[in-house]
């Protein structure tokens, strides 16, 4: 095990999918401040990616933005090429990229499930497999999940099912990859105020309800989620493997 | 009958509340803040309803911008 003066610091290269907006952006920023060289992947929002790049340059943070479609072999190869080109130990993959169709069962189709699973589960699986030869002996895989993996939320059937599959996949990876020095865990944020809510029906009311139900009386912030992600990927968590850490202010402990 | 582009524009409006006048063949995701990965599947769902077609994962991958959306939809409509 490498020695750290600070067990929470990070090293090497880390890929953050969906790493230029919301929780992913917070993780990219925090990980770079903690010592990692971050490859922040995105697909559609050039403005957000360029804004992150500008901040990184201003603050001297080692963040590279990389536009790639994770659902395609070509996009996955782009990620792998970038990891190899970094020429540093590859120490982490954080899967924040996600999509989903928010519909009730009456409107949901198998194709909606296919679309949702393609990015949320399949792309993650393909990336892990492709990057396996690159992972350093002491590295981490972290998947960002949601409460919908274990709880029924309105209009969340497709996304929740995909997150449940993602969590099960991570547990199995944790067991299979541990002998290779790769830990795998899940981080489950509760309600966090990001742009993702724009696509969710009744967002305002549901966020207000989340605040009301939260024992800490507020939503969790992206920075708090990012700090937990850093912990799970750091040497301080070297005994944690195959676990799902809930970051929700205690909301899910309520009856 | 409205052109494919006009109906795509209508779907953008119902999905993202965009001004229909702003949607052209040159429109790309960066032009519309809500057109992210989540927005993309919402848009695809709306396009399926508007055009009464089925879009698979490969179609979604191909629909990188409005020009490609119109191309994919034209192909689907020709096959009907």
Residue locations for each model-derived region?
Chain B
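Phosphopantetheine-dependent thiolation modules in NRPS/PKS and related acyl-activating systems
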Residues: 2-80
